[in-house]
Swiss-Prot record:
Gene assigned in the entry: infA
Family statement drawn from the similarity comment of this UniProt entry: Belongs to the IF-1 family.
Domain of life of the organism encoding this protein: Bacteria
Species of provenance: Mesorhizobium japonicum (strain LMG 29417 / CECT 9101 / MAFF 303099)
Keyword annotations of the record: Cytoplasm, Initiation factor, Protein biosynthesis, RNA-binding, rRNA-binding
Classification via PANTHER family: TRANSLATION INITIATION FACTOR IF-1, CHLOROPLASTIC
Domain S1-like span(s) in chain numbering: 1-72
Any Gene Ontology CC annotation: cytosol
Protein name stated in the entry: Translation initiation factor IF-1
Length: 72
């Protein structure tokens, strides 16, 4: 099965939510709820309020996403 087309957007973490979820404001002013990718969890990369992140989303649900990268 081919991998689905994913959309990537840069954003800023605005709020930390329970269960390792984050509220992220994208550059196009949309707010979504995102969780960290498994690789970030495994390597214990911390994400805090105000961090610039890269969010990966599926075209089917544009309200949820996965944080795949934290910019330095």
């Amino acid at each position: 099965m081919p991998k689905e087309e994913v959309l990537e957007f840069p954003g800023v973490v605005t709020e930390l939510l329970p269960n390792a979820m984050f509220r992220v404001k994208l550059e196009n002013e949309h707010e979504i709820i995102a969780h960290t990718a498994g690789r970030m969890r495994k390597n214990r990369i911390r994400v805090l309020t105000g961090d610039k992140v890269l969010v990966e989303m599926t075209p089917y649900d544009l309200t949820k996403g996965r944080i795949t990268y934290r910019f330095k």
